[in-house]
Amino acid sequence: MAHPNEEIARSATEAISKGDMEGFLSFHTDDTVVHFPGRGPMAGDHRGKDGVAKMFQQQMQLLDAPPEIENHDIVAGDDHTVVLNKTRATRGGKMLEQNQVVVMHIEGGKIAEVWLHFSDQQAMDELASS
């Protein structure tokens, strides 16, 4: 039987792929924090549901469509869940495909903090900044 935090991570990831901001935010605590690495326009610590919503909206404005996320594995425990996936994002007709590691801290059935790690951070920064 899968750990309940695995389903939270899977559902949150599916919401991103559908461009469903409300669905995505429903899996987060009110004081959630998303750490987006790099030097691109989305880089930084996005705090609270309002901050994460702004990041999500910015992502939707930058990309031609919501990113396609293919989860390879989800390892869930009581406090942390790790998602290994392949992400495809397109901007201006240019597609970037790369592996991603997402670490989530989950409290009381909600995502409290997220750390994103891209296999090619420079390519991600270039896509977001082009």
What residue spans do the PLM features occupy?
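A short, polar/proline- and glycine-enriched secondary-structure boundary/capping micro-motif
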Residues: 45, 93-96, 122-128
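Hydrophobic beta-strand positions in extracellular immunoglobulin-like domains
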Residues: 87-89, 106
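Short, cysteine-centered beta-strand-loop-beta hairpins and adjacent loop/turn segments enriched
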Residues: 64, 89-97
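A solvent-exposed, acidic/Ser-Thr-rich amphipathic alpha-helical stretch
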Residues: 25, 29-79
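Short beta-strand edge/turn micro-motifs at domain boundaries
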Residues: 103-125
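A short hydrophobic beta-strand element
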Residues: 77-87
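Short, low-complexity N-terminal intrinsically disordered segments enriched in polar/charged residues
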Residues: 1-30, 110, 125-130
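Short, surface-exposed coil-to-beta transition loops
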Residues: 68-69, 96-102
